[in-house]
Amino acid sequence: IGRAVQQECRVYILDSRANLYSFSLNGKKEWVLDLAPILEKNQKTHHSGGIALNQENLFVATGFGEIFSIKLDGSINWKKRFDSPFRGAPIFSNNKIFVLNANDLAIALNKNGETIWTLQGATRPTLLSKGVSPAAKSNKLLLPFSAGQLKAVRPNNGAQIWKVAFDQSNKGEAYSIIGDFGGSPVIKSNKVFLVSSSGQLLALNLNSGRKIWSVLVGSNSTPVINGGSIFVVSTNGQLVRIDENNGEVIWSRNISGSTSSNEKFFGPTLAGNFLWITGTDGYLRKFDPSTGKEFSKHRIGNQILYRTYAVHDKLFIITKSGKIIAFD
């Protein structure tokens, strides 16, 4: 299941069979649209795909290699098929749709579904099927490829501005690659933050790609940045707070209270001035962003494989079985 998106009083979710759901905030299912190809109905895909939106349309990339433009009432404007599944959600920026497929092809489309440009990125076989998305700001489009390489390109034509990769610091360019992206790149002010599954968090200058700092923290989730701090759920089960400016670790807390836990954790999500973390142990945990202290934990009773989503004054949790639970 990909990341939920919200538009006014509706939440849209894409599942592993390419069913697109529209829910009201009170949990009422308004409509469902089966986007799977005819010959692949009821089959699960290993790639999550995802959803982007503007004021009028949803742009949905599926794990079956198709991308759709869909009105908010569920009617389809157009669809376009590509040769490879989409691992993550598209983004919509400057009236264009940008998305990466599992073969590391970056694709730019206009709102009518016409291809503007494509760019083949560095690729390698990976066991990770979770999706990451591009990011865009200040006439720069950031493309995270599965070989651990990030390219900054011009959104209008795909021309390269700079590129970097994990685990090398030769004057801002890098070619020694240790792992896939654990989360999507995040742009804050004039910095780019990116995290690898295999143990590195980098801060880069947005204009040049020059490395500002790095810290040995890996994650399978996109970091949260707030109030000068970066919050990361690490691959070894810790909630880590890092100084945004210099990369120093301010504190690190074991999420489960045990250093030997084999559980996996997802998040964090910042909502109501607290950090929320879900996990395969079936708990929703609430932490203080200032100190890392755990305030409470709620037993959900099902394995949770996704970070929680905050929409208005509600938290939404999706369990492994596909059940959606909302908290006020």
Predicted regions and their residues:
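Extracytoplasmic beta-rich repeat domains
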Residues: 1-5, 30-52, 76-92, 115-138, ...
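Short loop/turn segments that connect beta-strands within beta-propeller blades
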Residues: 24-28, 71-75, 110-114, 155-158, ...
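Loop/turn-rich, solvent-exposed surfaces of beta-rich toroidal or solenoidal domains
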Residues: 229-241, 248, 252-286
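Conserved beta-propeller blade signature
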Residues: 10-13, 21, 57-60, 97-99, ...
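Structural signature of WD-repeat beta-propellers
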Residues: 15-16, 62-63, 101-102, 145-146, ...
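Beta-strand-rich domains and repeat architectures in extracellular enzymes and scaffolds
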Residues: 1-17
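C-terminal closing repeat unit and adjoining cap/tail of repeat-based domains
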Residues: 274, 279-322, 328
